[in-house]
Amino acid sequence: VNLQAGGTLDNRGRVEARGDTTVNADTIHSSHNSVWAAGLDDNGNTTRPGSLTLTAQHVQANGKNLATDTLAVHSQQIDLSDSQTAAGQIQLTAGQSGISTAHATVNADRLTAKTPGQFNNDGGQLVAREIHLTTPDISNLKGKINQTG
């Protein structure tokens, strides 16, 4: 699945693919009940090869964000708060506006997040074998960052 929008792409449903899912827009917004998924098999499980890439000036993905291989988000501001996000590798690259995984559940084999702004994981849960966070400011009030490897 390859989606391009010149303005806002508003996902209030499900965008699912057997392979890769790539989304480019000025703004990407996904509601709490939405799904972005890549690498789904016939039963709806992430077992097939597939990567999910979201690229926009502002990404707000508060639903389920799933990929078998890599989930990559590139944006000035990344808001994954309240989401359920899982992939083999998760790569979050944000600008000055920062990254939020507040009250989210994020699971990966390898999690990499880079921002010159704040990384907010208040009430969130990050679990990965390998975690690399590059930021000058981490807020983790009542959050959990669990590196298992």
Regions found by a protein language model. Give the residues of each.
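Extracellular beta-strand scaffolds
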Residues: 1-3, 7-11, 15-23, 27-36, ...
